[in-house]
Amino acid sequence: MSRVAKAPVAIPAGVEVTLNEQTITVKGAKGSLTRVINADVSVVVENNEIKCSPAEGVTSAAQAGTARALINNMVVGVNEGFERKLTLVGVGYRAKIAGNGIDLTLGFSHPLVHQLPDGVTAECPSQTEIVLKSTDKQLVGQVAAEIRGYRPPEPYKGKGVRYADEQVRRKEAKKK
């Protein structure tokens, strides 16, 4: 069995977990998440803990660790939530909230409007910062990657959209 799967997931107070065959639903203060778990993994809820183990006779131990990590992210998401911060670096690079999307000015001849999926909220503390929040870790990371993909940071001047904790590797300009 994988090392990750050996540790049970603790269910904090205020979080309700229901298991229906291979579908697990986690409800908490920030919302509700549902996921279908791989059939090669058996999930048991007991004593305010969730335990994942490979199903009997199946050799896919790695799936148990993956299922445990996904369930842990669901529990943390509905209890605390996840956030991802993006920073815009460059002259004239700006962001603002526009309805259910983010209006981005990234040096193109036209402004970009990125529509946010259900479950993700955004706020702009300043014109060059975006904070994405959600209960779903995968979804908030996907939206952040899509926004970063419009103008990834380039290595010579460092301009572009970057994660707040990202270190951009800089290159030296060509010498004459």
Swiss-Prot record:
GO terms for cellular component: cytosolic large ribosomal subunit. GO terms for biological process: cytoplasmic translation. Residues 151-176 are annotated as: Disordered. Gene3D superfamilies: Ribosomal protein L6, alpha-beta domain (3.90.930.12). GO terms for molecular function: rRNA binding; structural constituent of ribosome. Keywords: Ribonucleoprotein, Ribosomal protein, RNA-binding, rRNA-binding. Pfam families: Ribosomal_L6 (PF00347). This protein binds to the 23S rRNA, and is important in its secondary structure. It is located near the subunit interface in the base of the L7/L12 stalk, and near the tRNA binding site of the peptidyltransferase center. NCBIfam families: L6_bact. Part of the 50S ribosomal subunit. Belongs to the universal ribosomal protein uL6 family. This is Large ribosomal subunit protein uL6. It comes from Shewanella loihica (strain ATCC BAA-1088 / PV-4). The gene is rplF.
